[in-house]
Structures are given as C-alpha cells and as structure tokens.
C-alpha cells in the first residue's frame, strides 16, 4: 500500500513540475475542465473532510455576515466560535466546524465563510499560483486528488 502511495505522490509531483512550465491559460483550462468533471461525480456532502479537519480563515466580512445570520453580536460570535491564530487571523476555536451537521450539511451554508465557499480552490483562474496549495489539500480532499488524476491522463 505504501508503495502505491509513493508512486502516486511521485506522479503528482511530476505533474506539478510539468504544469509549472506550461502557460497560465493551459493550466487554467486543464483545471477548469477537470474540476467540472469531478464535481459531476463527487458530492462534498459525502465527505465534508474539509469541515472536519481544516479550519478556514474567517474574514471580518464573514464574521459580520454569520453573526447577523445566527442572531448574535459580533463580539459574542468571536468569543464563542473564534480564536486568533499565530498569523493574527480569525479561525475556528474547534474542529470539526461547529456549524457542520450530522448529515454533513452546513447550518450556515448561505452565509458560510469565503474560504469555505472557495474551497478547494480548483475552479478559479491563476491555478499555477495554487499548485503548492493543491498538493497540501490532496490528503484532505478526494476531489483535489481526482482532479490531479484527470489532468494527468
């Protein structure tokens, strides 16, 4: 099993090395196509690993929007749900996300943080700038892994 994982990691790193040498347009088109194909096959609700293991950075605009939605003051929201990390950013105090329901639905989906809205960042432009982030996300997000597999075909 470890050998297969090493081979897969090697192929992924080789692909990243190849993609770094390609034009931005080429890389963006490959990611866009693979992203669309993968998300026709995968539902994030089947996994929700990002909500269980990754803490998003929460912007001040997110804090205002979410606290208003759940009907508490900004100060109470910050006190009850957030902490300041080593980069001086607001992040969740606890994981899994306190807004993740048992069926993997998000109780604040309509107003979820912008970092959650954008995750896994595979359908934006300038994908060459995101490659190292994608490598870090592969262990957490099966969709990112499948996107790399599709691009590598």
Predicted regions located by residue number:
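Short loop/turn segments that flank or connect secondary-structure elements
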Residues: 1-153
């Amino acid at each position: 099993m470890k050998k297969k994982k090493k081979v897969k990691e090697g192929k992924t790193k080789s692909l990243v090395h190849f993609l770094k040498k390609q034009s931005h347009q080429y890389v963006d088109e490959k990611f866009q196509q693979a992203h669309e194909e993968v998300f026709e096959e995968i539902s994030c609700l089947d996994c929700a690993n990002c909500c269980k293991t990754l803490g998003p950075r929460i912007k001040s605009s997110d804090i205002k929007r979410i606290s208003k939605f759940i009907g508490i003051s900004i100060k109470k929201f910050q006190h009850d749900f957030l902490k300041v990390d080593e980069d001086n950013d607001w992040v969740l105090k606890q994981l899994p996300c306190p807004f993740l329901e048992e069926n993997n639905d998000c109780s604040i989906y309509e107003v979820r943080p912008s970092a959650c809205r954008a995750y896994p960042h595979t359908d934006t432009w300038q994908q060459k700038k995101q490659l190292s982030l994608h490598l870090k996300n592969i262990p957490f997000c099966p969709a990112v892994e499948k996107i790399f597999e599709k691009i590598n075909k």
